[in-house]
Amino acid sequence: MRYLKNFLVENLGDMTFAEAQKASGLHINIAVAPYNASQNPLILNALTAPNALVWSAVMASCAVPVLFPPVHLTSKRYDGQHTPYMSNTKWVDGSMRSDFPQEKMARLYNINYTIASQVNPHIVPFMQSDTE
């Protein structure tokens, strides 16, 4: 995980979701799920987790059990210092519990239609074809 973290920090920088949205004008959304099933999955973005660091959310999204271990999320304080985000919780890829949280996204952004591209190869056996 250390190499992945270094790669992400080098390429994504130390940006929070709020900073990334301000810099790009884009709404980045990353779905993560708690490793402990007693909590609900989250959508991390500039509205729900403005101070969470994007690289830590990407790490959590890569944490597929057996391949990568669950991780803690990191946020950035007003003074630039890093601090744990929900420190008692470790996070994994959102597809473990809620791959594409369409209803939450619709409420957050007041949208009626969604176009999504599924790029997770491990989910293919569970997909249903419209032609069947």
Task: Name each region found by the language model.
Residues M1-E132:
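Patatin-like phospholipase
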